[in-house]
Amino acid sequence: MALSHSVKERTISENSLIILLQGLQGQITTVDLRDESVARGRIDNVDAFMNIRLANVTYTDRWGHQVELDDLFVTGRNVRYVHIPDGVDITATIEQQLQIIHRVRNFGGKGQGRREFPSKRP
């Protein structure tokens, strides 16, 4: 997962199921869009607002016409459904992504280095 650069995006990801989609990076999947079209390709990136960048895409419009695209950017507002590939362990993927976020948040571990959210001093 290419980590979000802002604290806000990491917080949104951590507190929603978007973290599951971020864990699908590199997987080939199908994204159903609100206009009844379908895009199938490899997930390159998913941000905290569910914007999805796909590569090697087969785009099928609502009338069944197919177009091959090198890449496609889908805004989160236009996503209806993302198909989770059968081989993905959902629980393990979420836990792995949470560990990545927590590792970045703590900047090197407990008691080492600067913290993203400094602890309150009594």
UniProtKB/Swiss-Prot annotation:
<dbReference type="GO" id="GO:0015030">
    <property type="term" value="C:Cajal body"/>
</dbReference>
<protein>
    <recommendedName>
        <fullName>U7 snRNA-associated Sm-like protein LSm10</fullName>
    </recommendedName>
</protein>
<dbReference type="InterPro" id="IPR047575">
    <property type="entry name" value="Sm"/>
</dbReference>
<keyword id="KW-0694">RNA-binding</keyword>
<dbReference type="InterPro" id="IPR010920">
    <property type="entry name" value="LSM_dom_sf"/>
</dbReference>
<comment type="similarity">
    <text>Belongs to the snRNP Sm proteins family.</text>
</comment>
<dbReference type="InterPro" id="IPR052840">
    <property type="entry name" value="U7_snRNA_Sm-like"/>
</dbReference>
<dbReference type="GO" id="GO:0071208">
    <property type="term" value="F:histone pre-mRNA DCP binding"/>
</dbReference>
<dbReference type="GO" id="GO:0006397">
    <property type="term" value="P:mRNA processing"/>
</dbReference>
<dbReference type="GO" id="GO:0005683">
    <property type="term" value="C:U7 snRNP"/>
</dbReference>
<comment type="function">
    <text>Appears to function in the U7 snRNP complex that is involved in histone 3'-end processing. Increases U7 snRNA levels but not histone 3'-end pre-mRNA processing activity, when overexpressed. Required for cell cycle progression from G1 to S phases. Binds specifically to U7 snRNA. Binds to the downstream cleavage product (DCP) of histone pre-mRNA.</text>
</comment>
<dbReference type="GO" id="GO:0008380">
    <property type="term" value="P:RNA splicing"/>
</dbReference>
<keyword id="KW-0687">Ribonucleoprotein</keyword>
<keyword id="KW-0508">mRNA splicing</keyword>
<keyword id="KW-0507">mRNA processing</keyword>
<keyword id="KW-0539">Nucleus</keyword>
<feature type="domain" description="Sm">
    <location>
        <begin position="16"/>
        <end position="88"/>
    </location>
</feature>
<dbReference type="GO" id="GO:1900087">
    <property type="term" value="P:positive regulation of G1/S transition of mitotic cell cycle"/>
</dbReference>
<dbReference type="InterPro" id="IPR001163">
    <property type="entry name" value="Sm_dom_euk/arc"/>
</dbReference>
<dbReference type="Pfam" id="PF01423">
    <property type="entry name" value="LSM"/>
</dbReference>
<comment type="subunit">
    <text>Component of the heptameric ring U7 snRNP complex, or U7 Sm protein core complex, at least composed of LSM10, LSM11, SNRPB, SNRPD3, SNRPE, SNRPF, SNRPG and U7 snRNA. Formation of the U7 snRNP is an ATP-dependent process mediated by a specialized SMN complex containing at least the Sm protein core complex and additionally, the U7-specific LSM10 and LSM11 proteins. Interacts with CLNS1A and SMN.</text>
</comment>
<dbReference type="GO" id="GO:0017069">
    <property type="term" value="F:snRNA binding"/>
</dbReference>
<dbReference type="GO" id="GO:0071209">
    <property type="term" value="F:U7 snRNA binding"/>
</dbReference>
